[in-house]
């Protein structure tokens, strides 16, 4: 899918492979293919939708890492930390553009009607994902903490469930030429599974080990994300604890302030990188060193993040989140049971069923 005949853009296409070639779960294409095959569809029918989903996912990760100022992705530095924000944004944009081609190629394999339905589903997925991300960013921007669990679930449905669970299952069902009723039943299974998955991901962010998790431990606290644990802790904290927690969460993380981008400095840095006299990593270190020499507002400290984590443990918020995740998993099991009768007995159905136990047992 990556063009080999465009040498002038070789650097772009090389970076487009950066995230996909890192060790990952491959969850979205696996869901799409397993659903299609469990419904009697062919591997050929599911391959292109699955490839488009994986391209979209990696593009979303690049942009999400920039928006969240994340430092690690799949156990290695994020793309914007390695190559700078402008390059990373462009790589993400290119991956989104490239994801359209396999969807158009579908027409020659599954016909015009199913291909258009898949395009409609992907368009819905993109809109829901962007709205969910916007909702979370707005909560952080406004310092909004007057939120209930239902608000969190709604955000997760949009930001995570649509592109990670609902749409992969939906595309697999469409590729297998299933009717709307069965497709909707599978989508409900995927929705409940996705909510449980995201809650567990949030739990791992605070309790996992970086070697297994592959992302920054405690990153959600550094970024001030509204997770189920933080919302629960805020509801049960004393007024004094809550006020201090809100103050800490409103602070930027170290290095989050805009780095210097002087009109003379940037072209020089780019020239040094292009001539091989400075590595992309060295460029970023130089930018940060220059930024450190500038006066800064107060930033979060490790001690403050540790205080937030201690409050979460003190008020039983991790255990609460685990209980809620188990309830959503129970709903997913009920939804899967309703579908089980018309899923073909196969390794593909087994994979879908195995996800029910995997979601809460996973460590990354």
Model-derived segments and their meaning:
Residues 1-364:
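All-alpha prenyltransferase/terpene-synthase fold signal
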């Amino acid at each position: 899918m990556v063009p080999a005949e465009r040498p002038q853009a070789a650097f772009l296409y090389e970076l487009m492979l950066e995230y996909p070639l890192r060790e990952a779960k491959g969850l979205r294409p696996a869901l799409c293919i397993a659903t299609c095959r469990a419904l009697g569809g062919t591997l050929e029918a599911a391959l292109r939708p699955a490839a488009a989903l994986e391209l979209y996912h990696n593009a979303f990760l690049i942009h999400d890492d920039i928006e969240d100022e994340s430092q690690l992705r799949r156990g290695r530095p994020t793309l914007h930390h390695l190559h700078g924000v402008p390059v990373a944004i462009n790589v993400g944009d290119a991956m989104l553009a490239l994801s359209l081609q396999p969807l158009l190629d579908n027409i020659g394999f599954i016909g015009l009607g199913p291909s258009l339905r898949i395009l409609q589903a992907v368009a819905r997925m993109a809109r829901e994902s962007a709205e969910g991300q916007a909702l979370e960013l707005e909560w952080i921007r406004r310092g909004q903490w007057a939120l209930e669990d239902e608000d969190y679930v709604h955000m997760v449905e949009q930001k995570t469930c649509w592109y990670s669970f609902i749409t992969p299952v939906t595309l697999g069902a469409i590729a297998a030429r299933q009717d709307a009723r069965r497709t909707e039943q599978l989508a409900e299974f995927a929705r409940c599974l996705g909510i449980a998955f995201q809650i567990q991901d949030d739990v791992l962010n605070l309790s996992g080990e970086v070697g297994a998790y592959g992302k920054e431990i405690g990153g959600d606290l550094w970024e001030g994300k509204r997770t189920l644990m933080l919302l629960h802790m805020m509801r049960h904290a004393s007024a004094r604890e809550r006020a201090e927690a809100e103050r800490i969460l409103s602070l930027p993380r170290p290095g989050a302030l805009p780095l210097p981008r002087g009109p003379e400095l940037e072209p020089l840095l780019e020239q040094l990188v292009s001539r091989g006299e400075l590595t992309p990593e060295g460029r970023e270190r130089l930018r940060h060193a220059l930024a450190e020499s500038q006066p800064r507002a107060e930033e979060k400290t490790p001690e403050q993040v540790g205080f937030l984590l201690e409050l979460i443990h003190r008020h039983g918020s991790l255990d609460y989140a685990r209980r809620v995740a188990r309830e959503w998993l129970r709903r997913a099991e009920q939804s899967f049971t309703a579908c089980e009768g018309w899923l073909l007995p196969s390794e593909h159905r087994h994979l879908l069923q195995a996800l029910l136990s995997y979601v809460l047992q996973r460590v990354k």
